[in-house]
């Protein structure tokens, strides 16, 4: 049988997906985090892999799913949170625009799986399955009640799950994880299709969503999940030392308020008293596409007048950020390679060929 006859759609998918293979898995495993630092990698959306100087590995909001894949149904799902928010009927054209940079089934070394809330792009059954099948049998799954309900429903043993609410602290080796208030108002209108939100006092945010502060020996990381802007960021900034803060950024479509704007990101950073602010989530959905350079432009306009004590950092999915080594950088660039040029003699027709 010829090559073109033996190749199938399934063989094509298996040979190309996930796009990065186990490249990033291997990079994370091989990383030796220096004392006085922490390293983290952006997995897409709000997914983060954090590694401490003691070699502790935790992942937050690692999601391996996708968005719209067909025009088949032109209507939004009845009762969807965006329908409740804006009174829309048409299908939301949210296509995933980010490649899959980490293979969940190639994960071997992990000390905790965390989720900030139960929206589909922040918690993943494939990640849960991979960790249950391939990793140590004591790796905990940490999140608010709605996330634990999902994990248990998927088959994660209840005793492997830890329910957290604001004020709770969980120690995972040398990382101290503080659950803090979340400000994700979209989560409050994520309800069963037959349940009405109009005129009804929402149930508590604390069972649905949390923010996290990761205190490591080498510095502290604030993860805001899908939180909108809130005055309470200032309270968190008063109560905790925050070195790096991550905020969900995006260009909200007409009639929608679901992501922080560039101004919100700057206000969040100022309120938290962070040293570095990094936008995320803007990478993932085609209809929330936003340019993070806007944050830097506004920062340049305001930093001297408002005496900002922080810098913005523009990241790339799959890229690494090391605190404090990268604290004065403004943008990430993937490794360019070719640092070993001319270690062997080039094989060219003549020296001036190139």
Swiss-Prot record:
Pathway field: Cofactor degradation; L-ascorbate degradation; D-xylulose 5-phosphate from L-ascorbate: step 1/4
UniProt-listed Enzyme Commission number(s): 3.1.1.-
Keywords, in A-Z order: Cytoplasm, Hydrolase
Gene Ontology MF annotations: L-ascorbate 6-phosphate lactonase activity; manganese ion binding
Top-level taxon in the UniProt lineage: Bacteria
Single GO BP term: L-ascorbic acid catabolic process
Enzyme class per UniProt: hydrolase
Localisation: Cytoplasm
Any GO CC annotation of this UniProt entry: cytoplasm
Pfam families linked to this entry: Lactamase_B_2
Catalytic activity: L-ascorbate 6-phosphate + H2O = 3-dehydro-L-gulonate 6-phosphate
SUPFAM superfamilies from the UniProt entry: Metallo-hydrolase/oxidoreductase
Cofactor section: a divalent metal cation
Description of what induces expression: Induced by L-ascorbate. Repressed by UlaR.
Free-text function comment from the UniProt entry: Probably catalyzes the hydrolysis of L-ascorbate-6-P into 3-keto-L-gulonate-6-P. Is essential for L-ascorbate utilization under anaerobic conditions.
Record HAMAP family: UlaG
Sequence similarity: Belongs to the UlaG family.
Record NCBIfam families: PRK11709.1 (NF008688)
Protein name: Probable L-ascorbate-6-phosphate lactonase UlaG
Organism: Salmonella gallinarum (strain 287/91 / NCTC 13346)
Organism phylogeny: Bacteria, Pseudomonadati, Pseudomonadota, Gammaproteobacteria, Enterobacterales
């Amino acid at each position: 049988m010829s090559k073109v006859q033996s190749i199938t759609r399934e063989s094509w998918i298996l040979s190309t997906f996930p796009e990065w293979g186990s490249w990033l898995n291997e990079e994370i495993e091989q990383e030796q985090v220096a004392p006085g630092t922490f390293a983290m990698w952006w997995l897409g959306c709000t997914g983060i892999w954090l590694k401490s100087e003691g070699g502790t590995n935790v992942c937050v909001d690692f999601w391996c799913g996708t968005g719209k894949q067909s025009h088949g149904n032109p209507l939004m799902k009845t009762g969807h949170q965006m329908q409740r928010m804006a009174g829309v009927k048409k299908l939301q054209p949210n296509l995933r625009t980010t490649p899959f940079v980490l293979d969940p089934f190639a994960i071997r070394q992990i000390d905790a799986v965390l989720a900030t809330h139960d929206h589909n792009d922040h918690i993943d059954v494939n990640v849960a399955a991979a960790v249950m099948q391939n990793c140590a049998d004591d790796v905990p799954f940490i999140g608010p009640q709605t996330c634990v309900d999902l994990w248990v429903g998927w088959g994660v043993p209840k005793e492997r799950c830890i329910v957290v609410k604001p004020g709770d602290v969980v120690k995972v080796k040398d990382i101290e994880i503080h659950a803090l208030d979340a400000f994700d108002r979209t989560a409050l209108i994520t309800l069963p299709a037959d349940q009405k939100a109009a005129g009804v006092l929402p149930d508590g945010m604390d069972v649905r969503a949390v923010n996290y502060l990761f205190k490591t020996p080498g510095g502290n990381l604030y993860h805001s999940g899908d939180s909108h802007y809130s005055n309470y960021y200032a309270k968190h900034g008063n109560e905790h030392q925050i070195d790096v803060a991550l905020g969900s950024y995006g260009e909200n479509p007409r009639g929608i308020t679901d992501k922080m704007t560039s101004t919100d990101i700057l206000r969040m950073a100022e309120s938290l008293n962070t040293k570095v602010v990094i936008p995320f989530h803007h990478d993932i959905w085609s209809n929330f596409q936003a340019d993070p350079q806007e944050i830097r432009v506004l920062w340049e306009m305001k930093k001297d007048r408002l005496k900002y004590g922080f810098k913005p950092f523009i990241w790339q999915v799959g890229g690494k950020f090391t605190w404090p080594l990268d604290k004065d950088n403004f943008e990430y660039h993937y490794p360019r390679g070719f640092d070993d040029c001319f270690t062997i003699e080039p094989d060219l027709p003549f020296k001036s060929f190139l």
